[in-house]
From Swiss-Prot:
Keywords: Ribonucleoprotein, Ribosomal protein, RNA-binding, rRNA-binding, tRNA-binding. Residues 1-22 are annotated as: Disordered. Signal peptide: none annotated. This is Large ribosomal subunit protein uL16. One of its GO terms (molecular function) is rRNA binding. Belongs to the universal ribosomal protein uL16 family. Coiled coil: none annotated. Residues 1-14 have a biased composition (Basic residues).
């Protein structure tokens, strides 16, 4: 699963996920893309599950690019622990997603197969997405 190798600080503030994506909004590497039209957080497990679904569907053909990376740690306290005593330990990693961000790209397959593969991937993700092409944004 995806996670950073090293970080300057182990824990991070919660922050706010506002605004629209300004970078990574165009299909740059492949011919087809899966773009977020909603906002939210994608965990490393969700990103990997969607990648596996696409890879299995396109079999040996084509190439897939993952355009997002889970670089934000989410901490959690253990079960049945009293309040206080500091922040919990980092439990998993997420990527914060704004509307307009291209999540995955694909090349080397026809459009029908790409649409099917992205539909399988979108079912694994908690945010609404849409199919985009390199030429039609």
């Amino acid at each position: 699963m995806l996670q950073p190798n090293r970080r300057k600080f182990r824990k991070e503030h919660k922050g706010r996920n506002e605004g629209l994506a300004t970078r990574g909004t165009k299909v740059s590497f492949g011919e087809w893309g899966l773009k977020a039209i909603g906002r939210g957080r994608l965990t490393a497990r969700q990103i990997e599950a969607a990648r596996r679904a696409m890879t299995r569907h396109i079999k040996r053909g084509g190439r897939i690019w993952i355009r997002i990376f889970p670089d934000k740690p989410i901490s959690k306290k253990p079960a049945e622990v009293r309040m206080g005593n500091g922040k919990g330990n980092p439990e998993y990693w997420v990527a914060e997603i704004q509307p307009g961000k291209v999540l995955y790209e694909m090349d080397g397959v026809n459009e029908a197969l790409a649409r099917e593969a992205f539909a399988l991937a979108a079912a694994k993700l908690p945010i609404p997405t849409t199919f985009v092409t390199r030429h039609l944004g």
